[in-house]
């Protein structure tokens, strides 16, 4: 009788129930097979650096990797091009990871890492087939409202996922106690996007005006939905948005600076204490009106400003090419300068003649309104969703 197939994550991948139960790891390592070649979808990997996969992972893993076929892979080089990370996971690194965090490897094959604490690889638990395991210190942190023992970061992330504004947080844990909080850690295991971030994606891929406007309208709508739930991301930037496919949608990641509408938060380790939650996550994205004292969060007008910067990153690759220190480099001639940079960098697909150029000019004008120095002059989030949708 054929094995029963069940979806492992929201219907993207279907695996036999036996595979979900048994997992990917071997009960005991085996000797490496000299003829083994790691195959992931259409790509047979030439490097031998990942031969350890055969030693530690069973046929459930290698068969699933071989059969992967997400729609965003158009050619074999996409398999590893889309996978983030700066260094390959070798066997020694894998064994260290397995010793400390082996439960996360049940259905996860880590192949790359960054700084030895962020691991990227493949998992059927992710809708994209790619997943990320992140390990970080957690000696500070805030608590979710009315949810003792749950970090605000997790609460915001799970709420955003419910609103389709964030990738799935598959598993998480906080280790440590109040007494040893300086050595406490948070571990998150979640879905991973293409190239790791929107910044990485649009550094390599060219967008059409349609894709750009659609992504920005969708992102703005998701931020508005989160605010209506009383959640502010706190570190809005291109690096904290991932692309789940070639045309979007964009989804928010890294909620460690998330906060509520007020200026005070409850301490995670000392729930009876509150403190002022002041920081802007990334100074380069701070709006010009941000004060230096308490209440430094961006607020809604500040979020509109940050959306404008994200839009510039899509349009010209790096916002600093046209906009620095809250000011257009070319002053009132910014429209022509932005278009010149777009043409020079090839970051937007300008095919379509005069109609496309008119739409680009309309997009530049809307972004300029987001970047007004006076917060009162910026459009509301509701208006922004509507106007991005009309471009």
Curated annotation (Swiss-Prot):
SMART domains (alphabetical): S_TKc (SM00220)
All copies of domain Protein kinase, residue ranges: 109-391
UniProt keyword Glycosyltransferase present: no
Record-annotated active site: 235
Database matches in Pfam families: Pkinase
Binding site for ATP: 134
Keyword Transferase: yes
Keywords from the UniProt entry: ATP-binding, Kinase, Nucleotide-binding, Serine/threonine-protein kinase, Transferase
A GO molecular-function descriptor: protein serine kinase activity
PROSITE patterns documented for this protein: PROTEIN_KINASE_DOM (PS50011), PROTEIN_KINASE_ST (PS00108)
Superkingdom of the source species: Viruses
Enzyme Commission designation: 2.7.11.1
Catalytic activity reported: L-seryl-[protein] + ATP = O-phospho-L-seryl-[protein] + ADP + H(+); L-threonyl-[protein] + ATP = O-phospho-L-threonyl-[protein] + ADP + H(+)
InterPro entries registered for this protein in UniProt: Kinase-like_dom_sf, Prot_kinase_dom, Ser/Thr_kinase_AS
Protein family membership: Belongs to the protein kinase superfamily. Ser/Thr protein kinase family.
Protein name, as recorded: Protein kinase ORF14
Organism: Ictalurid herpesvirus 1 (strain Auburn)
